């Protein structure tokens, strides 16, 4: 048995591969890389080949081991499921087979309909669409002595010798032919230490390699331009780079060939494909990173469907400058130095925090820089502690206007922290910062579950000012109540992100440092947690009981986060679980049910699938 893993985050530790990615990916795509891992890949285009899987914020790449070329294989927006399969790979030797992790990625792809494949030499045109369940008949076949499951489908031109001749006869100076040897016994050693594997999914432990002939078989030319935008943008052909093959009627679209640029969408059909990754290591966290990146992508893609949110965080059309990491680093350093100036007032700090938030939303590298040193995290938490749950400035206890300014600043700080936590689970510096001073993290938890104190309306003794002051008080009271609601929603989002930190610790990401049981034990010992949980249940009831009104993208993401918090309370805290069951059983019976969710949650949101699954789990725990 190997020694226990020390860092907990072996996401990017191969210097040779890192240099290769830096050279072959655009700067913004390289900065978006989250993790990579050596594995054995099985799909329709890969036959037990030893490669690196490279995960970014939007794409999954494959490259050789050692790296020679890189190609995109799956976009996260097309992913349907990511499962850990509990099986024993027969092609691996005994020691490696026992410690291997089998990861199955099911994704939707789009191909030309069968009647459109008659043109000689035309390959399938692939383009990402959102998933719809395909009712394909699976049949069993034998290949190299192994049992496979595949979609029952006639032989297509994609399998013909003509395709191989086309690929080999169109060399590019950047192209590298991909070897596709069949491997009977493969072995990978030195992959790290032993840890318990995450709970395997039993969705289809029988299925081994890839199914479906709809999987793309692109050439190995290095085509690394990342599709710009998220699902809120139109899925137009212009999103994917194309080049002419020399024939005026043939275009390469990404890595696929289309017989005519005016091909109608009516000739396309969606199918499910599978990508299988076999990781020979018990310490690898690539499965958790894949799940986390997919979830983060769906949250971000849903939020960007909100016009107001997108207008704040999406770059203006026509104003995009070339991406330069050096400029982002310089910008971050400047913001940080201005925030740390002595005698900074709240009015000076607020615009700097807002600028940092917008910059971090647009550039992941700022999130890395934020966690690289711990001082900015401690600074922001200490600022929150100055004003929450009550202000240290005694004047704010009587001054409603001042309290409004303080709450606005606190909301901005918490929103910034939400962004800094999101998508940074692969950063070892984040874990080190949070573990160095757990007292700061627990202080933050208390702040998040506590309702902010607001000043009471002061009596007015001047009779001539009574009418005017009453209107002013009503205005400030309404504004404060609105801010309290916004604060609660923002605190919910940050509590969700912190719960993920502890949950990932349970699953192997720094498990020696964090555990969900510690966090829930601490929370249930804090008196404000009961009021906080009650407010979440009431908000869920209010949101699902509104008649004939669809949830906005931001409301949909908030609902998902609320369900995740409720699930954590029900699973990991006996005290909170009993409180929810004893006090809100009727709400779950009459208001929080599947028909209400289906009426309010649009199917077009990427987060809908995850929310529905989480909703089922919460209902089952309440029963």
From Swiss-Prot:
<protein>
    <recommendedName>
        <fullName>Uncharacterized protein C12orf56 homolog</fullName>
    </recommendedName>
</protein>
<dbReference type="Pfam" id="PF15087">
    <property type="entry name" value="DUF4551"/>
</dbReference>
<feature type="compositionally biased region" description="Low complexity">
    <location>
        <begin position="193"/>
        <end position="210"/>
    </location>
</feature>
<feature type="compositionally biased region" description="Polar residues">
    <location>
        <begin position="167"/>
        <end position="177"/>
    </location>
</feature>
<dbReference type="InterPro" id="IPR027878">
    <property type="entry name" value="DUF4551"/>
</dbReference>
<feature type="region of interest" description="Disordered">
    <location>
        <begin position="157"/>
        <end position="237"/>
    </location>
</feature>
<feature type="compositionally biased region" description="Basic and acidic residues">
    <location>
        <begin position="157"/>
        <end position="166"/>
    </location>
</feature>
């Amino acid at each position: 048995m190997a020694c226990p893993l020390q860092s907990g985050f072996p996401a990017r530790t191969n210097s040779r591969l890192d240099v290769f990615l830096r050279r072959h990916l655009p700067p913004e795509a390289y900065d978006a890389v989250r993790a990579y891992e050596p594995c054995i890949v099985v799909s329709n285009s890969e036959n037990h080949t030893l490669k690196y899987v490279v995960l970014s914020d939007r794409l999954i790449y494959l490259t050789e081991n050692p790296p020679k070329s890189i190609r995109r294989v799956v976009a996260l927006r097309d992913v349907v499921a990511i499962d850990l399969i509990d099986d024993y790979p027969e092609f691996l030797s005994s020691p490696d087979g026992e410690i291997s992790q089998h990861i199955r990625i099911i994704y939707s792809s789009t191909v030309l309909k069968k009647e459109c494949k008659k043109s000689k030499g035309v390959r399938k045109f692939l383009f990402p669409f959102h998933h719809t369940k395909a009712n394909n008949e699976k049949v069993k076949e034998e290949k190299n002595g192994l049992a496979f499951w595949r979609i029952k489908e006639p032989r297509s031109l994609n399998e013909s010798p003509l395709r191989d001749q086309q690929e080999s006869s169109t060399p590019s100076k950047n192209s590298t032919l991909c070897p596709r040897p069949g491997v009977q016994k493969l072995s990978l050693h030195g992959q790290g230490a032993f840890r318990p594997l995450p709970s395997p999914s039993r969705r289809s432990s029988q299925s081994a390699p890839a199914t479906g002939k709809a999987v793309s078989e692109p050439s190995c030319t290095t085509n690394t331009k990342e599709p710009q935008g998220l699902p809120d943008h139109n899925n137009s052909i212009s999103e994917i780079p194309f080049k002419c093959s020399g024939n005026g009627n043939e275009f390469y679209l990404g890595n696929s060939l289309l017989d005519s640029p005016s091909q109608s969408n009516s000739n396309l059909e969606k199918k499910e494909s599978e990508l299988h990754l076999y990781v020979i290591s018990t310490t690898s966290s690539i499965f958790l990173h894949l799940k986390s990146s997919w979830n983060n992508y769906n949250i971000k893609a849903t939020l960007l469907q909100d016009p107001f949110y997108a207008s704040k965080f999406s770059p203006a059309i026509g104003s995009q400058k070339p991406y330069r990491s050096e400029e982002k680093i310089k910008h971050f350093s400047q913001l940080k130095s201005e925030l740390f100036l002595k005698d900074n007032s709240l009015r000076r700090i607020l615009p700097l925090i807002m600028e940092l938030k917008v910059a971090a939303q647009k550039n992941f590298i700022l999130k890395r820089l934020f966690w690289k040193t711990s001082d900015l995290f401690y600074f922001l938490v200490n600022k929150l502690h100055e004003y929450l749950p009550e202000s240290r400035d005694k004047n704010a206890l009587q001054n409603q206007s001042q309290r409004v300014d303080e709450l606005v600043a606190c909301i901005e700080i918490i929103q910034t922290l939400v962004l800094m936590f999101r998508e940074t689970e692969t950063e070892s510096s984040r874990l080190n910062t949070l573990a160095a001073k757990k007292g700061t993290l627990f202080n933050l938890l208390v702040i998040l579950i506590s309702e902010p104190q607001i000043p009471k309306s002061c009596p007015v003794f001047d009779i001539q000012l009574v009418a005017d002051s009453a209107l002013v008080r009503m205005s400030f009271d309404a504004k404060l109540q609105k801010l309290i609601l916004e604060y609660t929603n923002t605190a919910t989002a940050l509590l969700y992100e912190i719960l993920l930190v502890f949950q990932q610790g349970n699953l192997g990401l720094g498990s020696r440092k964090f555990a969900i049981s510690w966090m829930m034990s601490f929370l249930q010992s804090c008196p404000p947690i009961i009021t906080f949980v009650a407010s979440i249940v009431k908000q869920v009831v209010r949101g699902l009981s509104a008649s004939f009104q669809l949830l906005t993208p931001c409301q949909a993401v908030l609902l998902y986060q609320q369900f995740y918090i409720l699930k954590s309370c029900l699973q990991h805290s006996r005290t909170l679980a009993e409180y929810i069951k004893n006090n809100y059983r009727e709400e779950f019976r009459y208001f929080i049910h599947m028909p209400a969710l289906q009426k309010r949650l649009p199917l077009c949101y990427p987060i809908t699938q995850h929310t529905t699954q989480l909703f089922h789990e919460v209902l089952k725990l309440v029963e």
